[in-house]
A protein has these predicted regions:
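A metal-dependent hydrolase metal-coordination microenvironment
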Residues: 1-100
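C-terminal functional module detector
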Residues: 8-11, 30-33, 75-82, 88-323
Length: 323
């Protein structure tokens, strides 16, 4: 009996539709040359379908296109559904949104279509820093770099190969990645970087205690102690990352129709989501051209939102004439 089957059995045991959802997933840990290209792969399905495959590993390939091919094979074989969520573009040394494929060839329409299909979300913040933007990319934004930059801008995930440089940042941070996506859409006809945003923890101790006063660290050697703040995490380029550089963050929030695997996955697929640094905020907005002030006071705010426009994560088309 494989560890994977034990894992899916655990998720199945604790999954209680309508009350507590335990989704099946795993982390694909591609890190070529120390550059973070990790993806979290989430199943819409249960053990019956997930057990028909064994997770595709970065030991088999570090090329995201190989992962997408495996995901396509899974869906064809089982009738199930998958999506992948990249994280920590801030530690990719410019590779998260690079304008070439893994082998260095220019992006094609086929590549853009496949990436847009499989990777509809990106993680904006987590324990290993903030991937939204950098002060050098947004010099007029007083909040750029307000948190989650210190220690993480030294270099890539493993502090190998070469230090981070300003030239890398337009293809590693999310705001800049969205702009690159629009540029590619104009060129290719498809936007490869059209994604919604979620938060996450990336802690490996199975705890979601992410409040600053209840933070249990990423690994067991970072759990609470008087001296954990100066625990050495990584060293390279004459720099040191310490535990104090890690963030107590973050959360993924999902506007699902019900508390089930299927509904939560579907909401993620349509990008009706948002991320926070850990605060449990309720955020919901819609976009459209037919809303009236009275809609804000409606007892069914969401109904008006869906009827007259599109939800967060949706496509807002060009305004009609006169609006």
């Amino acid at each position: 009996k494989s560890v994977w089957q034990q894992y899916t059995a655990t998720a199945e045991k604790y999954n209680d539709p309508g009350r507590f959802t335990a989704m099946i997933g795993y982390e694909w840990t591609s890190v070529p040359g120390g550059n973070n290209l990790h993806r979290n792969v989430l199943f819409r399905d249960g053990k019956d379908k997930a057990d028909q495959v064994f997770p595709f590993s970065s030991w088999q390939s570090e090329d995201p296109e190989k992962l997408w091919a495996w995901m396509d094979q899974y869906e064809t074989r089982t009738g199930g559904r998958l999506l992948a969520i990249p994280h920590n573009g801030n530690l990719s040394n410019g590779r998260m949104f690079e304008l070439t494929d893994f082998s260095g060839q220019p992006l094609t329409r086929d590549y853009a279509e496949r990436r847009a299909r499989w990777e509809v979300l990106q993680e904006i913040v987590q324990t290993k820093g903030n991937s939204e933007t950098h002060p050098t990319l947004a010099p007029n934004d007083e909040f750029a770099g307000d948190m989650g930059i210190a220690g993480w801008e030294y270099g890539n995930l493993t502090l190998e190969d070469k230090p981070e440089s300003p030239e890398m940042r337009p293809t590693m941070y999310l705001r800049a990645g969205l702009l690159r996506g629009l540029e590619q859409e104009a060129k290719l006809g498809v936007n490869p970087f059209k994604f919604g945003l979620v938060g996450g923890t990336d802690v490996h101790n199975s705890l979601t205690a992410i409040e600053e006063d209840n933070y249990f660290g990423k690994h067991v050697n970072q759990e609470p102690s008087p001296h954990r703040w100066n625990h050495v995490s990584k060293q390279g380029f004459g720099k040191t990352r310490y535990t104090w550089h890690y963030l107590a963050a973050g959360y993924a929030a999902v506007w699902a129709t019900e508390n089930t695997r299927e509904a939560i996955w579907d909401a993620m697929k349509r990008k009706e989501v948002y991320g926070t640094t850990g605060t449990r905020l309720t955020v919901r907005f819609f976009g459209g051209y037919d809303y009236q002030p009275a809609d804000l006071n409606s007892r069914n705010f969401a109904w008006a939102g869906y009827q007259k426009g599109v939800p967060m994560g949706g496509d807002l088309t060009k305004a009609p004439a006169g609006k």
